[in-house]
Amino acid sequence: GASTSASSNSGTAPPSPMIRKPYLLFLADAPDRNACKTAFGVAFWRPHECVGELRYPEAKTDCGTPAMDVREAARRGAKTLLVGLAPSGGAFAPRWIETLLEALDAGLDIASGMHVRLDSVDAIKDRARSKGRTLHDVRLPPPSIPVGTGRKRPGKRLLTVGTDCNAGKMFTSLALEK
């Protein structure tokens, strides 16, 4: 996905740096398990890469990782807050923005797969820049991906497709990778 480096002032994202591990999974106020499929997938398939999860008291689900706030996650070595849910409408709630700002203040980068880009929220973009943090919008491809040619390449690939956002493509791909 595309990343916006804190040092970048252009509208074009630099080459995508790796998302730093381990993660703090952000569940916010998730109403159910389906709302936070990303967090569940990472907790299930990469538990060793998660220090814990941050969920608000009214959240109706958890991933089974230790509950903690941003400061505790930073003390335990978290490097990136991973936005692990996608609400209907795909926007960041004001309360979430405050939590994301707190994560940046604690020295964490932020990774998100939501439709709304992290750097489209001025407060997040400005804070990341001032703190030297990186914002990863993983839904956006980096500009360096070449256009396909149809020519055979080395390696194996598998396309997983589904008719909606809840068809199990990620879990299928990760199960095959394992």
PLM regions and their residue ranges:
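Low-acidity, Ser/Thr- and Arg-rich intrinsically disordered low-complexity segments
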Residues: 2-10
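N-terminal accessory targeting/assembly segments
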Residues: 15-72, 77-78
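Generic hydrophobic/aromatic pocket-lining and core-packing "Φ" positions
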Residues: 39, 70, 96-100, 177
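Redox-cofactor binding/interface segments in oxidoreductases and associated redox assembly factors
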Residues: 82-86, 112
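Glycine/threonine-rich flexible loop motifs
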Residues: 88-96
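Extreme N-terminal, non-catalytic leader segments
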Residues: 99-101, 105-157
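Walker A (P-loop) phosphate-binding motif
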Residues: 145-178
